């Protein structure tokens, strides 16, 4: 029986609006593409979420991916508030689930920097019953340890949890830990999947 709903944040309770953010600076399409490839599309971007290195050290790493757009990279990363926008349904959905008796948690790859600069988009977090951000644990999904850490921290039974994430590899990692998991695309698509698990 499912008692606990665990949400990813990016592209689940928020929209990851990196393209809109980069284009908001008025760069040409070519420059926007280069900045994206050097930053949000790069492997090094995950270091923000891992929370081990200092922000400036990570930014220096990203600049090395394409030094020709260093100025633009630094400009985009100096103001990251536009990277995330809250989904309108976030708080109502959380409250509805809690009213029905479910406990609601978050488990997300998220950076200190984004958390600081996107506070308004994350105003639903205080409504939740708890959760884990990758930067705080120095672990990132799909590492199995981060799922185990959430279960241990809140004394949750894996068989009583369902996890919603927009990335298939993270869904599969949750299932490997005995957690029911749904690949999230939209709330409308997720509701019948939750219902199949007995979540009303």
Name each model feature, range by range.
Residues 20, 43, 57, 61, ...:
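Alpha-helical elements of Rossmann-like donor-binding domains used by nucleotide-donor carbohydrate transfer enzymes
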Residues 1-40, 176-177:
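Active-site neighborhood of HAD-like aspartate-dependent phosphohydrolases
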Residues 22, 39, 58-63, 77-80, ...:
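Hydrophobic alpha-helical core bundles mediating ligand binding, dimerization, or RNAP-core interactions
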